Amino acid sequence: MPNWVFNHLTVKGDSKDIDVVKAQLNSPFSKEHTSWNPKTQTLDTSTTMYSNPVFAFWNIVRPDDLEAYHKTPEHTIGQPANEMFKGNDWYSWNIRNWGCKWDVAIADDNHFIDTSMDELKDGGVQYNFDTAWSPPSEAIEKLSSQHPNLTFKLYYEEEQGWGAEVEYINGEGKVILEYDDRCHECSEINSMDYCDECGCNVCLKCKMNREERACIHG
């Protein structure tokens, strides 16, 4: 299982421009998927429908060479990171163009039920979704360049506690806040320190550990 990154993307600007983004991201599409069949010892191909994807990296940028995209990734153990994702297989292409391993679009079988959109009181919208291992920085950068009149803010936090807030305007990202850890109790950033007595990380401010129990040694 991957480490998950929890993302919140706000989009603000003129309501007509926001409506264009909403329509783009929620545009219906279909994709072919391959999976290994242990009974037949072959790869099975199936088509997945996305009638109401809500938010889809596929609707921001998609590969031109679908034949190459659907090939099985060929990565070698110990291969340098800068050489791992040069191919056009789905894994390499996704990492290069989206910044993360998988899309977050909601399929008709509700595979990604954690993806949602909220209307904000100021007229903007917020998308909420989870990505594997890393935030979708490349995808949001491309989306921002496609809509230069809108302001995109990506808030993300990995399940171990590191995260950031990045603002995108006209394809340019600016880091507003970046941290290595955050206390889930008091929200203090970069405040976690290892306690030998507790055997876990404890917030230096509120003395709570990751399990949200008070550290008696603080």
Regions found by a protein language model. Give the residues of each.
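Short, intrinsically disordered terminal segments enriched in charged and Pro/Gly residues
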Residues: 210-218
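Short cysteine-rich clusters marking metal-coordination/redox-active sites
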Residues: 183-186, 195, 203, 215
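Zinc-coordinating Cys/His ligand positions in small cysteine/histidine-rich zinc-finger domains
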Residues: 189-191, 200-206, 212
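Short glycine/proline-enriched coil/turn segments at helix->beta-strand junctions
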Residues: 148, 191-192
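Long, contiguous binding/interaction regions
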Residues: 1-182
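Intrinsic disorder/low-complexity signal
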Residues: 16, 184, 192-196, 210-211
